[in-house]
Amino acid sequence: MSIQENLNNLIKPHGGKLIKTLKYGAERDECIKEAKSLPKIDISSREFGDLVMMGIGGFSPLNGFMKKEDWFSVCKNFTLADGTFWPIPITMSVSEEEAKKLKRGQKVALKYNKDINDISGTIEIDQVYEMTKKDKEMECKDIFTTTDSDHPGVKKVMEQKPFNVAGKVTTLSEGEFPIKYKGIYMTPEESRLNFAKKGWKTIAALQLRNPMHRSHEFLAKIAVEVCDGVFIHSLVGNLKPGDIPAEVRVKCIDALVDKYFVKKNVLQGGYPLDMRYGGPREALLHATFRQNYGCTHMIIGRDHAGVGDYYGPFDAQKIFDKIPYNADPKKRLLTQPMKIDWTFYCHKCDGMASLRTCPHTKKDRVIVSGTMVRKMLSEGKTLPDHFGRAESLKILADYYQHLDKSKKVTIKLQKFATGDAMK
């Protein structure tokens, strides 16, 4: 089949087509010229990542920041107000002083202070609405299942400014993502074209925010056995303190793919979001935008997108069985979860295994987790061989060896990272 035929056979984007708010070339230049004369609002790192995702079509069918009715429906019903599935609010906040100056129909320039370009985008104001402390707490309880300020996602929401601004956006910058992560950072159009060139139709996405260790490799290879290919898709936006930067993680993946994967069955990519640490809800978001990237399946393992002990080890799998069904395929989530049980290194099996394949006991097993990898390396300890491939472990050891002491944080092991909760 031709590349175009292969493209046509890929899973449809959420909403039926890719909605892209990013401008290019002369049109972008004209928009920037206009934006420089507009009032300006500073946006956060998270908001900038969301703006870029809307720009490249990753958040299709969204074309702007959410109105209050959409925000409320997403929190309570997992859908936009029109019934289209969406699991996490995509909002932009402003101060009370800024809110008083904004009017419906007004256009405002958006700027992220670390953007390498002068203007990040614009928004045409549709609605300005207050977010009281009670509103924010409701969002946190619905999305993160907690209002505990120690939860990094909760902390971000509670620190947001007191008003949200809704409206259609125009994205005028992708920041440094295409330059810093050249060849890795990928738009949905680019991933779809890559899949079509490879002749793939069924694709499993592997979400990564930690260095790729043996459990990740095991998950990816399970997926390759049942799908045409696996898309190793790394977050290249901001993480919490103590997490390993994307450029280091990308090197680890490169080393693994180069020596331990059949190259025609794997593709590495990156996406521009900040991590929300939303556990089950974020797992749904990961599946939603992977549909836009062209993936039919989303690998969901233990404690997907989790942090601390806020979620059960497989809550992120269970939530897929609870989301609303819509008869209209354009309005429902089409990408399916690939649910995988506890994975670990078993000394008696002499390799990676899962509860479905290993008959041995807890004492024979070693849980391989990103948290454990970061904790041991940050404490100057040497990781056992079964935690990762030698090539990637060397990259990680070199990173920690040269890490400024002021950037080191104490890493606590949650119970799922130790395997205590495993049967």
UniProtKB/Swiss-Prot annotation:
Q: Where is this site: Transition state stabilizer?
A: 213, 216
What residues does ATP bind to?
207-210, 301-304
Q: Which residues form the signal peptide?
A: none
The catalytic site is made up of 209, 210
Q: Which CDD domains match?
A: ATPS
**The protein's enzyme class:** transferase
Where is the protein found, in the record's own terms?
Mitosome
Please tell me where sulfate binds in this chain: 207, 209, 305
UniProt keyword terms in alphabetical order: Amino-acid biosynthesis, ATP-binding, Cysteine biosynthesis, Methionine biosynthesis, Mitosome, Nucleotide-binding, Nucleotidyltransferase, Transferase
Which Pfam families does the protein's record reference? ATP-sulfurylase (PF01747), PUA_2 (PF14306)
Task: State the Gene Ontology BP annotations.
Answer: cysteine biosynthetic process; hydrogen sulfide biosynthetic process; methionine biosynthetic process; sulfate assimilation
Which GO cellular component terms, listed alphabetically, does the Swiss-Prot or TrEMBL entry include?
Answer: mitosome
- The Enzyme Commission number assigned here is 2.7.7.4
Give the pathway listed in the UniProt entry for this protein.
Sulfur metabolism; hydrogen sulfide biosynthesis; sulfite from sulfate: step 1/3
Q: Which reaction does it catalyse?
A: sulfate + ATP + H(+) = adenosine 5'-phosphosulfate + diphosphate
Among PANTHER family, the record links this protein to: PTHR43509, SULFATE ADENYLYLTRANSFERASE
Biological role stated in the UniProt entry: Catalyzes the first intracellular reaction of sulfate assimilation, forming adenosine-5'-phosphosulfate (APS) from inorganic sulfate and ATP.
Q: Which family does it belong to?
A: Belongs to the sulfate adenylyltransferase family.
Q: What is this protein called?
A: Sulfate adenylyltransferase
